[in-house]
Regions:
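Soluble periplasmic/extracytoplasmic beta-strand elements of cell-envelope proteins
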Residues: 46-53, 77-81, 89-91, 116-124, ...
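A structural "domain/chain start" motif
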Residues: 20-91, 95-103, 176, 182-191, ...
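Short, aromatic- and cysteine-enriched interfacial helices/patches
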Residues: 63, 136-140
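Short secondary-structure boundary motifs at beta->alpha junctions and helix caps
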Residues: 140-151, 157-205
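Bacterial Sec-type N-terminal signal peptides, specifically the leucine/valine-rich hydrophobic h-region
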Residues: 14-17
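Short coil/turn motifs at beta-sheet boundaries
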Residues: 40-42, 114, 143-147
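Short, solvent-exposed, polar/charged sequence segments at loop or secondary-structure edges
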Residues: 71, 83-137
């Protein structure tokens, strides 16, 4: 009899737990460069994106597998932000074989454009840290903050002369905080998305500075 009661309680608990499951989703607005959708009447200049390397100490230690994930991620972010400025036609050099194959399948001859300038980039600083605090020796709660910092350099290189005609930098910091009060509240686990967020912020700032340089006449892309 007791076994049947225990079994019934177990089944009821599973049903209740299953009934408590919730699912939610929402779209998140993606930050864009300052010049996105601004009124610009000028011509878009063709520009190519060259190497984007991770020159920081992050993921570059003796135990690194040699794959530059930070640099590859940064290059993808840079191409998107450059295109969204409305000042450039970004030339894709990373998928040449795929583009060639697709053109062949479509029976079309390629008419590739050249660029007078190449943008190269480096992640010069990148780091993460966690800081915590306790209030009244932890009796009133404790907190933990994850902080990610990134700094990038962008260089505009003349393809004919190899001169660096203009340079900009961008830096950003992201943090995630969580506080637990007298045993209540969540704990902030490691959030790997902070890497992408802080890279996006730093590169976006550098691209904004690049556009500002065009607008104040510091450099002029080829028309």
């Amino acid at each position: 009899m007791m076994k049947k009661i225990a079994l019934g309680i177990g089944v009821s608990a599973m049903v209740l737990l299953g009934g408590c499951a919730t699912e939610s989703s929402r779209s998140v607005e993606v930050p864009k460069v300052a010049s996105y959708n601004t009124n610009y009447q000028g011509a878009r200049s063709p520009i190519s994106v060259g190497k984007f390397d991770n020159r920081s100490n992050y993921m570059n230690g003796v135990f690194s597998d040699g794959v530059d994930r930070l640099g590859n991620q940064s290059k993808t972010i840079l191409m998107t932000h450059l295109q969204q400025t409305g000042r450039f036609n970004v030339l894709d050099r990373a998928n040449m074989e795929e583009i060639k194959s697709e053109a062949k399948m479509a029976g079309k001859s390629q008419q590739l454009k050249g660029a007078d300038y190449v943008v190269t980039g480096d992640v010069t600083e990148f780091g993460r840290k966690e800081v915590g605090d306790r209030q009244l020796f932890g009796i009133l709660g404790r907190g933990k903050t994850q902080i990610a910092y990134a700094k990038v350099n962008l260089n505009i290189v003349n393809v004919r002369t190899s001169e660096v005609v203009y340079s900009v930098q961008g830096a950003g910091e992201y943090e995630l905080s969580n506080r637990e009060v007298i045993g209540f509240g969540g704990t902030a686990s490691y959030d790997s998305t902070l890497n992408g967020k802080v890279l996006d912020l730093a590169i976006r700032e550098a691209v904004n500075n690049l556009v500002t340089g065009i607008e104040n006449g510091s450099w002029k892309p080829a028309q």
